[in-house]
Amino acid sequence: MGFNEKENSLEYWDNIHSKYERNEIKLDDWLDKFETIIDSCSTPILDLGCGSGNDTLYLINKNKQVISCDQSSNAINNIKKNFPEVYDTKCFNMLDGMPFDNNSFELIIADLCLHYFKEKDTFELLNEIRRILTVGGRLIFRVNSVNDVNHGAGQGNEIEHHLYETSDKRLKRFFDEKDIKFFFKGFDIEYLNEEIMTRYKLEKRLYRVCVKKK
């Protein structure tokens, strides 16, 4: 991702996360499917691309230690304000690498934050995730589906297979099952399912996935 693309992305998300209160954050039950995995995790859980803190709130409600991360300083400032009990926060762009030691986490959550990158950058990002996961550690995530027509699938300039440049010059990738198996071939895929949710009052199609470090 070039400099301008990174700047455009950061400006977009800083605007999205300008200000919100804890009572405005809505819980999403998508992680319930992995309750056993989450409940058995006794070490801090990494929440990548935490945004407004939906998953951070879910994990805190389960008495988990959470490290909430986002590239937007606005998002991180809101997390600190709304969740003073959060274990830790980090503000960084994932394309610059993960500021964590090898084998630091047994569980990483990445909700709708892994589908904004070119193929080369996606593989580098996943290599970083694999580096900081323990052997047998898991990454639980959701990504856009190629069927997500209400949220941009097939729209804009296709610069790579299933990767589009939006009208505001951001990148947005849409996955099918074959794409997920291609990008996550360095992991064992334990769960993979295309699902429907409501986002911004419109139907959204996405994949819910759990992979394990080999």
Where are these regions (language model features)?
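Conserved beta-strand/loop positions that form the S-adenosyl-L-methionine
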Residues: L48
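A short glycine-rich, Lys/Arg-flanked "PGG" loop and its adjoining helix->strand segment in the class I
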Residues: F123-V135
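GHKL-family ATP-binding catalytic core of two-component histidine kinases
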Residues: P99-D101, K118, D176
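A short SAM/SAH-binding and catalytic strip from SAM-dependent methyltransferases
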Residues: E106-K120
